[in-house]
Amino acid sequence: MNPNSKTQSDNALWRYWRGLGGWNLYFLAKFALLWFDYLNFHALPNLVFMAFLLMPIPSQRLHRWRHYLAIPIGIALFYHDTWLPGINSILSQGSQLAGFSAQYLLELINRFINWQMVGAAFVLLIAYLFVAQWVRVTVFTVAALVWLNIVNIAGPAVSLLPATSTASAGGANTPATSVPAAGDAAPADSLPPTSANLTAYLNQFYEREKGRVTAFPATLPADAQPFDLLVINICSLAWADMEAVNLQNHPLWSKMDIMFDSFNSATAYSGPAAIRLLRASCGQLSHHDLYQPVNQQCYLFDNLAKLGFKEQLMLDHSGVFGNFLKELREQGDMQAPLMSQAGIGNELTSFDGEPIYNDLELLTRWLDQQQKGGDGRTATFFNIIPLHDGNRFVGSSKSADYQPRAQKLFDQLNTFLDQLEKSGRKVVVVIVPEHGAALVGDKMQMSGLRDIPSPNITHTPVGIKLIGMKAPHQGSPLQIKTPSSYLALSELVSRLVDGKVFSESSVDWQALTQGLPQTPVISENDNAIVMQYQGKPYIRLNGGDWVPYPQ
């Protein structure tokens, strides 16, 4: 073969180097989003995609087909680079989406559109068209992506960009790192926050949690005092939500005897949250293990039933959506019959079109039933959803504002506590939200979206009020500032289970709450894990690498 003809052939091939053309805009948009932490950018797949677009192809027809093929690939890669829910998550939630009302779906679509970003994209388009007249933009695009791949060798590219902040995501309410109680040592977090070390820390955490359990007494003493335990499980309430609507100082919270300031709900969805609460007597499980059999001693209400407490169940909704009631039965072992909702009024309609019953009326009915039942021991689980996103007032097609709904709920609970005080019954009221409402979105997910269990969603206000005491608590609530979760609630209930605290002439509240189990802040949904490590939040999506949670 003639060497000259080979050289001419090679030169002819490289004459078909056409540049990125309009795909420059695709990558420039990604760079802009990455700079402001709106992407979970995967540098190498993007470099491979760029190489595919740049590869010289002599045939005009094949070149055209390459662009047709690149469109779905580019869309899929862009989606993969976002913080949006994974395909598995969307498929798993698909049946629930089908249950949403048409008005709520339209509202979610409208909320999803960020008009500021649409405007910024338009400006970027005009700027690109203007500059591309004189500048070969492909050169700068390739250089930028190659640079991102080079710096990514040392770790995720997103963590090396100037816009990234690793400040704690809980703001003023995020608990500081605390020294664990003796015999309750948490896994060490002294190693550098590499992806491997973070995964090892998570595995150590779950291994440790498997061995933690609340020790309830086998029997109650002869002088034990009967009382009612009422657990009020509120959907969509976090500290961040209360601050967003200025209700963090509502009188309800000042009535509490004990407040957990650093409680972690460990999940952002209702079913898993309720299961975790009903299984509070054992350490924190992974999301996968929530749906696996566990030892019977893990079930809080079963432990109480063995000591003579009658289990009771109340809902202010049907429990049909998302198979919520079914999960309570199967994974939470809550077998008590559902208290009747007949004759209870409703002012709210849920996001799926079903009625939400008046909570004060339900609680008043519960109190009447306890009074008629005498002084026996009862343990009641009450799940309520008036604060859920998409709920609307009866007769309206528009979602009701969160603030008036929260105000009314807090007022109703406040009124009910007054009713309990007047009733003369001995009652332990535990207010423990499932998760937050995500009223304020962040760079990872829009307002109302809870696919990622961010600190603002899982940092929930938990309060305990003891009613009917001979020596009631005086002054402001006792604050538990250490990182806590459901095991601490179970332990506290076990300390109160004999009811003697109601008849004592004085109560040492510090001793009552001393040494409660501490739990590191780790939250998990089906495809996302958010974890505090060395005082900073990190996130892992779909089993990938850990990256700092964008602020």
Please give the residue ranges for each predicted region.
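Active-site-proximal alpha/beta segments of enzymes that process anionic O-linked groups
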Residues: V158-F393, Y486, E491-Q510
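Histidine-centered active-site microenvironments of extracellular/periplasmic hydrolases
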Residues: Q8-D10, K426, V432-H473
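Short glycine/proline- and charge-enriched loop/turn segments
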Residues: R279-S286, D333, S396-D401, Q445-L449, ...
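Transmembrane and membrane-interface helices of multi-pass
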Residues: M1-T174
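A structural motif corresponding to the C-terminal end of an alpha-helix
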Residues: L304-G308, F416-K426
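A short beta-strand-to-alpha-helix junction
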Residues: Y291-C298, S399-Q407, R450-T458, K470-V493, ...
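Active-site His/acidic residue clusters
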Residues: G322, W366-D411, T415, A438-L449
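Phosphate/adenylate-binding glycine loop and adjacent helical scaffold
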Residues: V497, V501-Q551
